[in-house]
Structures are given as structure tokens and as C-alpha cells.
Amino acid sequence: MAYRAMSEDNTSVIGFASSGDGYNFEDRPTEPMYTPREAFEAKLVPGGNSGCEDPRLTKIGETIYMLYTAFNGKSEPRVALSYIKLDDFITRCWNWSRPILISPPNVPDKDAALFPKKIKGKYAILHRLGVSIWLDYVDDLQFGGNKWLKGNVIMSPKDELPDTEKLGISGPPIETREGWLLLYHCVSRKTQPMTYYVAAALLDLKDPSKVIARRKVPILEPETYYELNGQVGNVVFPCGAVVIGEDLFVYYGGGDTVIGVATMKLSELMNSLITWAGLETELTKLVKKK
């Protein structure tokens, strides 16, 4: 697991921890696996927030790509990209590539992740511009000059519950036979401070710009003391999930202070999405027979 950690002077770095069962992370080195290295993530305001935030990792072939939010305390937060060879990651030789910015200057852009496979021969990248989730396709991962992330909106707050202010992806989509399972966070202005909760959607396998199912009620919301309180209260904020056996493990930040895990049967979530959308699939037929 890659996770964001913050020092006493509010510098964000990325730590590493591993687990044999998905619950207990006893293997947790004291040194970070990734630290700020470039001017766009250096601390420009003493004591202010800066560094590398909210990493999302995607394995494609023998390479692990990491998209994260780079912030120096003055400029708008932007999406940065770095990568590492799978063998180096496994052996913890942190030979990360030099990071590059991939989102446009002077525009706040966050919550980005790569799909775990190319779509029609192109890299597919989800990111958040403004208050909505965008999808962009690119031929390669070379950015700069006049080439920046853009794309089109695929999900926006107007399609959520009435009090939703903004939303962003929780982590890379998970491929299922029914579609790409996308977990995403929503920010509700019903409370102060605002509440971050998690919802789920299903994207078309061949054309993920098509949202084929969307469960607008939360699958995870702040309930415990450590989710309701902390550096920022009323927050559950995942950056990744994994399927282990028949279960979906969702790893999230609680109250911007601790890391938790929530689990549920993948089949139950998929069935609720499909039922919510009124879709008739092999999965729903099987459930009906039972």
C-alpha cells in the first residue's frame, strides 16, 4: 500500500506498507518510498502544506505508474506522474522516474489515475477538473509544451444527491465482466465541515466515457470517531481498492489522520449497481435464480 504521510512542518510524502491478509500492515518501513524532488512540489510557504499528495498506483505490464497531486503551497495543485519498474518496486529499490506535471498550469487538477490497460490503443486517464470527473485519452505519457490533460466530463455533481458540491475518483477503476467498477468520493455541503463519502459507478468496458450504472447513495460514509474527527473531520477518502477472493477491500483515510479498510462482497456491490440501473445481465439472472 502506498499512502500519504505528513511531517510536522506539513510536508506530504508517500509511505509504503505491506500486508499478507489485507488487514494487518505490520511491514511498514520508517522511511518514505517517495519524497518531493521538484520545484513544483517544494515548500514555498514555511509551515504551509506542500509535497506529494493522494497517490494512485496502476500496474501496466512490468511498470507501476503513480499519479499524485503536486503542491508547493502557492501555485494551483496539479497532477504529477512518476513510474517505477515492477521488479524495483517489489524489491523496494525506489528508483522512481523523475516526476513530470501532466495537467495544465494555473488550473487546479487533482484525483487522477490511469486505467490498468489501454483503451483502443490509448492510455486512459481519469482526473478532476473543477467539481467533475474528466476522462482523457492519450497516445503516450509524454507531457509538456502544449500537451496537457484535458478530455471530457463523464460525471458531475448535478447527477448526484442534491447537496453534492464536487466529486473525484477514489482510485484506478477495477475491471469486471460487467464493466469498469469506479469508486469515487462525493463532497456534501449538508454539514460543516463538509462530509466526504464514497459512492460507486460502472463504466462501459469498451467506452468508459459511458456511465452505465451509478449508485448515488453512499457505500461508505463517516460514522466512527476517527472518521468524524481528526485533522479534517467528516471524511472517508479512499485512493485505492483491491479484490481479494470474493471481497472488495477499500483503503481510505479517516478524518485525514488515520488509514482504515472497509470490505464488502464484490458481487453484492455489482448486483446493487446493476439493479439500481435496471440492467439485465448474466449476473442478475443468476441472482434471480437463487
Regions flagged by a language model, labelled:
Residues 2-48, 59-113, 117-165, 175-231, ...:
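Beta-rich carbohydrate-recognition and catalytic domains
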Residues 51-56, 110-115, 169-172, 237-240:
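Beta-propeller and closely related beta-sheet repeat lectin domains
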